[in-house]
């Protein structure tokens, strides 16, 4: 790899967008009516070899907003116990959770010479919908994420590994997946991030991404000289 900085590689790889993996656990399927109960995030960076790797992690238990609906079927699916003393002690408001997350995201955007973050998620439209609804409820003016574009690992996994379920896609990629920790926003975000990196790096190793090809051509010319 020639002397191209990590920040430059990241900013050029995704057209100035910094990919940030988001996972949410909720009280249902309606982002405007149902509660946002957990949010997890994994930021990404590049190593000196140009490989995409997981970086900082963030997770928060969230107190349901006033008037929020919580379906019992959703709690049964996620295993979240709203009456858990540990959860009640740790839970914060949507505003506080997003404020802390966005502070970390903005810092990472700046350090990677990017202009904005882009949400990466497994079935990304679901996570994006709940994130945008929470941003609207909290009247957050400076949203670091692109408001509608996203990168979906369910679709990418179908292309790369022939799987769309997160656990099965991880298995196909050789990534350990603990079913007991599934549907924890922090864990799912970290596993999704590892899966996304696997797909992007595999594509690069197979000869994709224009910057990689340019770098290889430059290295070849330098060797000839």
Residue ranges and their predicted role:
Residues 2-122, 225:
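Conserved non-catalytic scaffold segment of RNase H-like nuclease domains
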Residues 23-25, 127, 152, 188:
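Acidic active-site catalytic centers that drive phospho-/nucleotidyl reactions
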Residues 26-28, 155, 191:
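Short, glycine/acidic-enriched loop or turn micro-motifs at the edges of active sites
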Residues 29-31, 158, 194:
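Conserved protein kinase catalytic core
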Residues 62-78, 82-85, 153-189:
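Active-site-proximal helix-loop-helix substrate-binding element of RNase H-like nuclease domains
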Residues 109, 126-148:
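Substrate-recognition/cap helix-loop segment adjacent to the acidic, metal-dependent catalytic center
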Residues 118-125, 129-130, 134-135, 167-225:
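Acidic, Mg2+-coordinating catalytic module of metal-dependent nucleases/exonucleases
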Residues 141, 160-162, 215-219:
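Catalytic phosphate/metal-binding cores of nucleic-acid and nucleotide-processing enzymes, i.e., regions
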């Amino acid at each position: 790899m020639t002397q191209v900085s990590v920040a430059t590689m990241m900013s050029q790889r995704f057209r100035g967008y910094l990919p940030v993996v988001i996972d949410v656990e909720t009280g249902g399927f309606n982002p405007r009516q149902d509660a946002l109960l957990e949010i997890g995030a994994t930021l990404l960076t590049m190593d000196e070899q140009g490989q995409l790797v997981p970086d900082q992690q963030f997770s928060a238990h969230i107190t349901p907003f006033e008037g929020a609906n919580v379906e019992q079927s959703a709690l049964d699916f996620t295993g979240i116990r709203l009456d858990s003393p540990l959860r009640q002690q740790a839970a914060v408001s949507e505003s506080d959770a997003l404020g802390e997350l966005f502070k970390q995201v903005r810092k990472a955007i700046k350090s990677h010479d990017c202009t904005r973050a882009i949400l990466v998620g497994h079935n990304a439209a679901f996570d994006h919908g709940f994130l945008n609804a929470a941003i609207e409820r909290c009247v957050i003016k400076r949203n670091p994420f692109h408001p509608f574009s996203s990168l979906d690992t369910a679709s990418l996994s179908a292309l790369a590994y022939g799987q769309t379920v997160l656990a099965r896609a991880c298995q196909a990629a050789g990534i350990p997946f603990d079913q007991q920790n599934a549907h924890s926003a922090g864990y799912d975000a970290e596993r999704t991030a590892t899966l996304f990196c696997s797909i992007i790096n595999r594509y690069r190793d197979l000869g994709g991404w224009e910057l990689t090809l340019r770098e290889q051509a430059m290295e070849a010319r330098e060797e000839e000289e």
